[in-house]
Amino acid sequence: MLRAYDKERVMNKQHEAAKRYAHVVGWGKYTPERILTNAELARMVDTSDEWIQQRTGIRERRIAHDHETTATQATHAAREALRRAGLTPDALDLIIVATSTPDYIFPATACLVQAAIGANRAGAFDVQLGCAGFVCALSIGGSMIQSGMIQRALIIGAETISRFLDWTDRNSCVLFGDGAGAFVLQSSPTRGGLLSYKLGADGSGWETLILPAGGSKHPLSQQTLDAGLHRPRMDGHAVFKFATRVMGKVAQEACELADLQLADIELFIPHQANLRIINTASKFLNLPDEKVMVNVDKYGNTSAASVPIAFCEAMDSGRIHAGDHVVLVGFGAGLGWAAATLQL
Protein backbone atom coordinates (compact mmCIF):
# COMPACT_ATOMS: atom_id res chain seq x y z
CA MET A 1 0.00 0.00 0.00
CA LEU A 2 1.17 3.58 -0.67
CA ARG A 3 2.16 5.74 2.30
CA ALA A 4 -0.14 8.74 2.78
CA TYR A 5 2.67 11.17 1.95
CA ASP A 6 3.63 9.30 -1.22
CA LYS A 7 0.00 9.07 -2.30
CA GLU A 8 -0.53 12.81 -1.84
CA ARG A 9 2.70 13.68 -3.63
CA VAL A 10 2.00 11.45 -6.64
CA MET A 11 -1.65 12.48 -6.84
CA ASN A 12 -0.76 16.16 -6.76
CA LYS A 13 1.71 15.75 -9.61
CA GLN A 14 -0.71 13.73 -11.70
CA HIS A 15 -3.64 16.06 -11.05
CA GLU A 16 -1.60 19.18 -11.80
CA ALA A 17 -0.76 17.72 -15.20
CA ALA A 18 -4.34 16.60 -15.83
CA LYS A 19 -5.85 19.91 -16.90
CA ARG A 20 -6.53 17.95 -20.06
CA TYR A 21 -7.74 14.36 -19.98
CA ALA A 22 -6.67 11.52 -22.26
CA HIS A 23 -9.78 9.64 -23.39
CA VAL A 24 -9.84 6.30 -25.20
CA VAL A 25 -11.81 7.17 -28.34
CA GLY A 26 -10.87 4.18 -30.49
CA TRP A 27 -9.75 0.59 -30.01
CA GLY A 28 -8.85 -2.25 -32.30
CA LYS A 29 -7.28 -5.70 -32.28
CA TYR A 30 -5.83 -8.17 -34.71
CA THR A 31 -5.21 -11.87 -34.22
CA PRO A 32 -3.90 -14.18 -36.94
CA GLU A 33 -6.34 -16.57 -38.58
CA ARG A 34 -4.25 -19.64 -37.81
CA ILE A 35 -5.38 -21.37 -34.60
CA LEU A 36 -3.08 -23.83 -32.83
CA THR A 37 -5.00 -26.03 -30.42
CA ASN A 38 -3.72 -28.02 -27.47
CA ALA A 39 -4.56 -31.21 -29.35
CA GLU A 40 -2.27 -30.15 -32.19
CA LEU A 41 0.51 -29.30 -29.74
CA ALA A 42 0.12 -32.75 -28.18
CA ARG A 43 1.15 -34.21 -31.54
CA MET A 44 4.27 -32.01 -31.58
CA VAL A 45 5.59 -32.34 -28.01
CA ASP A 46 5.04 -34.52 -24.96
CA THR A 47 1.93 -32.80 -23.59
CA SER A 48 -1.85 -33.05 -23.54
CA ASP A 49 -4.87 -30.79 -23.58
CA GLU A 50 -5.59 -31.71 -19.96
CA TRP A 51 -2.01 -30.97 -18.84
CA ILE A 52 -1.98 -27.54 -20.52
CA GLN A 53 -5.43 -26.48 -19.32
CA GLN A 54 -4.79 -27.55 -15.73
CA ARG A 55 -1.58 -25.53 -15.52
CA THR A 56 -2.40 -22.50 -17.67
CA GLY A 57 -6.09 -22.36 -18.58
CA ILE A 58 -5.11 -22.14 -22.26
CA ARG A 59 -7.08 -24.11 -24.89
CA GLU A 60 -5.69 -22.55 -28.07
CA ARG A 61 -3.59 -19.69 -29.37
CA ARG A 62 -3.12 -17.75 -32.64
CA ILE A 63 0.06 -18.15 -34.69
CA ALA A 64 1.17 -15.64 -37.32
CA HIS A 65 1.47 -16.77 -40.93
CA ASP A 66 4.85 -16.51 -42.63
CA HIS A 67 3.94 -13.21 -44.29
CA GLU A 68 2.81 -11.62 -41.01
CA THR A 69 5.08 -9.67 -38.69
CA THR A 70 4.74 -7.59 -35.55
CA ALA A 71 4.46 -4.46 -37.71
CA THR A 72 1.77 -5.87 -40.00
CA GLN A 73 -0.30 -7.07 -37.06
CA ALA A 74 0.12 -3.69 -35.35
CA THR A 75 -0.97 -1.96 -38.55
CA HIS A 76 -4.19 -4.00 -38.72
CA ALA A 77 -5.03 -3.13 -35.10
CA ALA A 78 -4.14 0.54 -35.68
CA ARG A 79 -6.46 0.87 -38.67
CA GLU A 80 -9.33 -0.68 -36.73
CA ALA A 81 -8.76 1.68 -33.78
CA LEU A 82 -8.66 4.71 -36.09
CA ARG A 83 -11.85 3.57 -37.80
CA ARG A 84 -13.67 3.32 -34.48
CA ALA A 85 -12.33 6.75 -33.47
CA GLY A 86 -13.52 8.26 -36.74
CA LEU A 87 -10.07 9.71 -37.35
CA THR A 88 -7.66 9.72 -40.27
CA PRO A 89 -3.98 8.88 -39.69
CA ASP A 90 -2.89 12.49 -40.26
CA ALA A 91 -4.76 13.45 -37.07
CA LEU A 92 -2.19 11.56 -34.96
CA ASP A 93 0.63 13.33 -33.13
CA LEU A 94 2.33 10.23 -31.74
CA ILE A 95 2.58 6.47 -32.24
CA ILE A 96 4.02 4.18 -29.56
CA VAL A 97 4.42 0.45 -30.11
CA ALA A 98 5.05 -1.79 -27.11
CA THR A 99 6.74 -5.01 -28.19
CA SER A 100 9.44 -7.50 -27.25
CA THR A 101 9.43 -9.01 -30.74
CA PRO A 102 10.08 -6.10 -33.13
CA ASP A 103 10.56 -6.67 -36.83
CA TYR A 104 14.11 -5.33 -36.47
CA ILE A 105 16.44 -4.25 -33.68
CA PHE A 106 16.23 -0.95 -35.52
CA PRO A 107 14.31 0.88 -36.91
CA ALA A 108 11.48 1.06 -34.40
CA THR A 109 8.39 -0.93 -35.28
CA ALA A 110 6.36 2.23 -34.62
CA CYS A 111 8.09 3.85 -37.60
CA LEU A 112 7.02 0.96 -39.83
CA VAL A 113 3.44 1.38 -38.64
CA GLN A 114 3.61 5.14 -39.21
CA ALA A 115 4.65 4.58 -42.82
CA ALA A 116 2.09 1.82 -43.39
CA ILE A 117 -0.90 3.89 -42.25
CA GLY A 118 0.35 7.22 -43.59
CA ALA A 119 0.50 9.07 -40.26
CA ASN A 120 3.01 11.54 -41.63
CA ARG A 121 2.65 14.09 -38.80
CA ALA A 122 3.21 11.61 -35.99
CA GLY A 123 6.33 11.00 -33.98
CA ALA A 124 7.00 7.31 -33.45
CA PHE A 125 8.97 5.12 -31.06
CA ASP A 126 8.89 1.73 -29.34
CA VAL A 127 8.66 0.74 -25.68
CA GLN A 128 10.06 -2.54 -24.36
CA LEU A 129 8.86 -3.72 -20.96
CA GLY A 130 7.78 -7.24 -21.84
CA CYS A 131 4.19 -8.06 -20.98
CA ALA A 132 3.83 -4.76 -19.08
CA GLY A 133 4.82 -2.77 -22.16
CA PHE A 134 1.38 -1.71 -23.36
CA VAL A 135 0.27 -0.23 -20.04
CA CYS A 136 3.66 1.49 -19.74
CA ALA A 137 3.24 2.95 -23.25
CA LEU A 138 -0.28 4.04 -22.32
CA SER A 139 1.10 6.00 -19.37
CA ILE A 140 3.58 7.79 -21.64
CA GLY A 141 1.03 8.71 -24.30
CA GLY A 142 -1.59 9.66 -21.74
CA SER A 143 0.83 11.84 -19.78
CA MET A 144 1.90 13.67 -22.94
CA ILE A 145 -1.74 14.45 -23.73
CA GLN A 146 -2.44 15.52 -20.15
CA SER A 147 0.58 17.83 -20.22
CA GLY A 148 -0.70 19.55 -23.35
CA MET A 149 2.23 18.44 -25.50
CA ILE A 150 0.05 16.51 -27.95
CA GLN A 151 -3.62 16.06 -28.80
CA ARG A 152 -3.85 12.48 -30.07
CA ALA A 153 -1.80 9.31 -29.68
CA LEU A 154 -1.97 5.79 -31.06
CA ILE A 155 -0.79 3.23 -28.50
CA ILE A 156 -0.19 -0.33 -29.72
CA GLY A 157 0.84 -3.61 -28.13
CA ALA A 158 1.96 -6.19 -30.70
CA GLU A 159 3.90 -9.45 -30.63
CA THR A 160 5.03 -12.30 -32.89
CA ILE A 161 6.41 -14.51 -30.13
CA SER A 162 5.94 -17.72 -32.10
CA ARG A 163 9.06 -16.95 -34.16
CA PHE A 164 11.24 -17.19 -31.06
CA LEU A 165 9.83 -20.30 -29.41
CA ASP A 166 11.49 -23.68 -29.04
CA TRP A 167 8.72 -25.90 -30.36
CA THR A 168 10.28 -28.94 -28.67
CA ASP A 169 10.01 -27.40 -25.17
CA ARG A 170 6.59 -28.18 -23.74
CA ASN A 171 7.10 -25.81 -20.81
CA SER A 172 7.30 -22.72 -23.02
CA CYS A 173 5.82 -23.39 -26.46
CA VAL A 174 2.35 -24.07 -25.03
CA LEU A 175 2.12 -20.67 -23.36
CA PHE A 176 2.35 -18.03 -26.06
CA GLY A 177 0.42 -16.65 -29.00
CA ASP A 178 0.63 -13.80 -31.50
CA GLY A 179 -1.54 -10.72 -31.94
CA ALA A 180 -1.92 -6.96 -31.59
CA GLY A 181 -4.19 -4.44 -29.91
CA ALA A 182 -4.40 -0.65 -30.14
CA PHE A 183 -5.93 2.40 -28.43
CA VAL A 184 -6.44 5.87 -29.85
CA LEU A 185 -6.13 8.49 -27.11
CA GLN A 186 -7.52 11.99 -27.57
CA SER A 187 -7.32 15.14 -25.47
CA SER A 188 -10.52 16.38 -23.82
CA PRO A 189 -11.40 18.92 -21.11
CA THR A 190 -13.99 16.49 -19.74
CA ARG A 191 -12.92 14.50 -16.70
CA GLY A 192 -12.46 10.83 -17.53
CA GLY A 193 -10.24 8.71 -19.69
CA LEU A 194 -6.94 7.77 -18.10
CA LEU A 195 -7.11 8.69 -14.41
CA SER A 196 -3.95 7.23 -12.87
CA TYR A 197 -0.82 5.21 -13.57
CA LYS A 198 1.47 3.16 -11.36
CA LEU A 199 4.72 1.69 -12.69
CA GLY A 200 7.38 -0.34 -10.94
CA ALA A 201 10.29 -2.71 -11.46
CA ASP A 202 12.54 -5.14 -9.62
CA GLY A 203 15.65 -5.26 -11.77
CA SER A 204 17.25 -7.84 -9.50
CA GLY A 205 15.01 -10.39 -11.21
CA TRP A 206 16.23 -9.62 -14.72
CA GLU A 207 17.34 -13.21 -15.36
CA THR A 208 13.95 -14.68 -14.40
CA LEU A 209 12.51 -14.17 -17.88
CA ILE A 210 15.02 -13.53 -20.63
CA LEU A 211 15.92 -14.01 -24.27
CA PRO A 212 19.69 -14.27 -23.78
CA ALA A 213 21.13 -13.68 -27.26
CA GLY A 214 20.60 -11.27 -30.12
CA GLY A 215 21.57 -8.11 -28.27
CA SER A 216 24.95 -6.45 -27.85
CA LYS A 217 26.00 -8.72 -24.95
CA HIS A 218 25.57 -11.92 -26.97
CA PRO A 219 25.23 -10.96 -30.65
CA LEU A 220 24.23 -13.50 -33.27
CA SER A 221 26.85 -16.20 -33.77
CA GLN A 222 26.98 -19.88 -34.58
CA GLN A 223 27.76 -20.51 -30.91
CA THR A 224 24.64 -18.70 -29.65
CA LEU A 225 22.50 -20.50 -32.21
CA ASP A 226 23.92 -23.90 -31.26
CA ALA A 227 23.32 -23.13 -27.58
CA GLY A 228 19.69 -22.16 -28.18
CA LEU A 229 20.23 -18.70 -26.73
CA HIS A 230 17.77 -17.10 -29.15
CA ARG A 231 14.85 -18.78 -27.40
CA PRO A 232 13.07 -17.36 -24.33
CA ARG A 233 14.13 -18.79 -20.98
CA MET A 234 11.87 -18.55 -17.97
CA ASP A 235 11.86 -19.61 -14.34
CA GLY A 236 8.15 -20.37 -14.26
CA HIS A 237 7.93 -20.78 -10.49
CA ALA A 238 9.66 -17.45 -9.86
CA VAL A 239 7.46 -15.67 -12.41
CA PHE A 240 4.34 -17.09 -10.76
CA LYS A 241 5.45 -15.92 -7.31
CA PHE A 242 6.32 -12.47 -8.66
CA ALA A 243 3.08 -12.04 -10.59
CA THR A 244 0.79 -13.14 -7.78
CA ARG A 245 2.63 -10.84 -5.36
CA VAL A 246 2.59 -7.76 -7.58
CA MET A 247 -0.56 -7.79 -9.69
CA GLY A 248 -3.19 -7.27 -7.00
CA LYS A 249 -1.06 -4.77 -5.10
CA VAL A 250 -0.38 -2.51 -8.09
CA ALA A 251 -4.07 -2.61 -9.06
CA GLN A 252 -4.95 -1.35 -5.59
CA GLU A 253 -2.33 1.40 -5.78
CA ALA A 254 -3.58 2.60 -9.15
CA CYS A 255 -7.11 2.79 -7.75
CA GLU A 256 -5.92 4.79 -4.75
CA LEU A 257 -4.17 7.29 -7.02
CA ALA A 258 -7.47 7.81 -8.87
CA ASP A 259 -9.47 8.16 -5.61
CA LEU A 260 -11.32 4.97 -6.48
CA GLN A 261 -12.31 2.00 -4.38
CA LEU A 262 -12.21 -1.50 -5.81
CA ALA A 263 -16.00 -1.50 -5.50
CA ASP A 264 -16.05 1.35 -8.05
CA ILE A 265 -14.37 -0.82 -10.68
CA GLU A 266 -16.63 -2.40 -13.29
CA LEU A 267 -13.89 -4.53 -14.87
CA PHE A 268 -10.38 -5.68 -14.00
CA ILE A 269 -8.34 -6.42 -17.13
CA PRO A 270 -5.08 -8.17 -16.18
CA HIS A 271 -2.30 -9.37 -18.44
CA GLN A 272 -3.42 -12.76 -19.74
CA ALA A 273 -0.41 -14.87 -18.78
CA ASN A 274 -1.94 -17.77 -16.93
CA LEU A 275 -5.41 -18.44 -15.52
CA ARG A 276 -4.00 -19.46 -12.13
CA ILE A 277 -2.23 -16.10 -11.81
CA ILE A 278 -5.40 -14.22 -12.79
CA ASN A 279 -7.50 -16.19 -10.30
CA THR A 280 -5.00 -15.59 -7.50
CA ALA A 281 -4.97 -11.83 -8.14
CA SER A 282 -8.76 -11.71 -8.36
CA LYS A 283 -9.06 -13.52 -5.04
CA PHE A 284 -6.58 -11.08 -3.46
CA LEU A 285 -8.71 -8.17 -4.69
CA ASN A 286 -11.94 -9.96 -3.67
CA LEU A 287 -13.37 -9.45 -7.15
CA PRO A 288 -16.21 -11.66 -8.44
CA ASP A 289 -15.77 -13.45 -11.77
CA GLU A 290 -18.07 -11.02 -13.59
CA LYS A 291 -15.63 -8.19 -12.82
CA VAL A 292 -12.57 -9.98 -14.21
CA MET A 293 -11.76 -10.19 -17.92
CA VAL A 294 -10.36 -13.56 -19.03
CA ASN A 295 -9.56 -14.63 -22.59
CA VAL A 296 -6.26 -16.45 -22.04
CA ASP A 297 -8.09 -19.65 -23.00
CA LYS A 298 -8.45 -18.42 -26.61
CA TYR A 299 -5.19 -16.57 -27.22
CA GLY A 300 -2.59 -17.73 -24.70
CA ASN A 301 -0.02 -15.21 -23.50
CA THR A 302 0.30 -12.53 -26.19
CA SER A 303 2.67 -10.46 -24.03
CA ALA A 304 2.31 -6.71 -24.67
CA ALA A 305 -0.75 -7.35 -26.86
CA SER A 306 -2.78 -9.17 -24.21
CA VAL A 307 -4.24 -6.19 -22.32
CA PRO A 308 -5.49 -4.27 -25.38
CA ILE A 309 -6.83 -7.45 -27.00
CA ALA A 310 -8.74 -8.24 -23.80
CA PHE A 311 -10.03 -4.65 -23.61
CA CYS A 312 -11.30 -4.82 -27.20
CA GLU A 313 -13.14 -8.07 -26.49
CA ALA A 314 -14.67 -6.58 -23.34
CA MET A 315 -15.91 -3.55 -25.28
CA ASP A 316 -17.19 -5.54 -28.24
CA SER A 317 -19.04 -8.05 -26.04
CA GLY A 318 -20.73 -5.37 -23.92
CA ARG A 319 -18.84 -6.19 -20.72
CA ILE A 320 -18.07 -2.47 -20.26
CA HIS A 321 -19.87 0.71 -21.29
CA ALA A 322 -19.52 4.50 -21.29
CA GLY A 323 -18.89 5.80 -17.78
CA ASP A 324 -17.50 2.52 -16.44
CA HIS A 325 -14.22 2.38 -14.52
CA VAL A 326 -11.59 -0.14 -15.63
CA VAL A 327 -8.21 -1.20 -14.22
CA LEU A 328 -5.51 -2.43 -16.61
CA VAL A 329 -2.50 -4.33 -15.22
CA GLY A 330 0.57 -5.73 -16.94
CA PHE A 331 3.61 -7.55 -15.54
CA GLY A 332 6.54 -9.37 -17.04
CA ALA A 333 10.21 -9.43 -17.95
CA GLY A 334 12.45 -6.98 -16.17
CA LEU A 335 10.92 -7.73 -13.78
CA GLY A 336 8.50 -4.90 -14.45
CA TRP A 337 4.87 -4.01 -13.87
CA ALA A 338 2.40 -1.26 -14.75
CA ALA A 339 -1.21 -0.43 -13.95
CA ALA A 340 -3.64 2.23 -15.12
CA THR A 341 -7.19 3.20 -14.27
CA LEU A 342 -9.54 4.72 -16.80
CA GLN A 343 -13.12 5.86 -17.09
CA LEU A 344 -14.78 5.15 -20.41
Give the ranges of each region predicted by the language model.
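Active-site pocket-lining segment
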Residues: 230, 243-248, 262-285
